[in-house]
Regions:
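Enriched for short, Lys/Arg-rich terminal
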Residues: 1-12, 16-23, 56-59, 64-82
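A short, surface-exposed loop/turn module that caps and links secondary-structure elements
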Residues: 30-54
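Short, intrinsically disordered/low-complexity patches at protein termini
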Residues: 29-30, 46-48, 62, 77-79
Length: 82
């Protein structure tokens, strides 16, 4: 399992959202960290910039994958890509 680092901006968004939604997102992040090749992860490479996108319902998680899984942004669909 990879180590997960959540950046302050993403942590702030997670704290402000409903607990059930935040737990769903954190569960999906941890599932990806445990098995990056599972098809249920719903991961896509970002177009035009480095990083990957994790889809959790109407929420998107922008991450950088390497030795450490770096969670950069969490936001609603559409607004997270700015």
């Amino acid at each position: 399992m990879k180590q997960v680092v959540i950046q302050p901006a993403a942590r702030k968004v997670l704290r402000k959202m409903p607990v059930t939604t935040a737990n769903r997102i954190l569960d999906k992040i941890n599932a990806y960290a445990a098995d990056p090749y599972a098809q249920a992860n719903n991961i896509t490479a970002l177009a035009g910039r480095p990083g990957i996108r994790l889809r959790v319902g109407d929420w998107r998680v922008i991450m950088r994958d390497g030795e450490v899984l770096d969670v950069l942004k969490v936001g609603p669909r559409g607004g997270v890509y700015d």
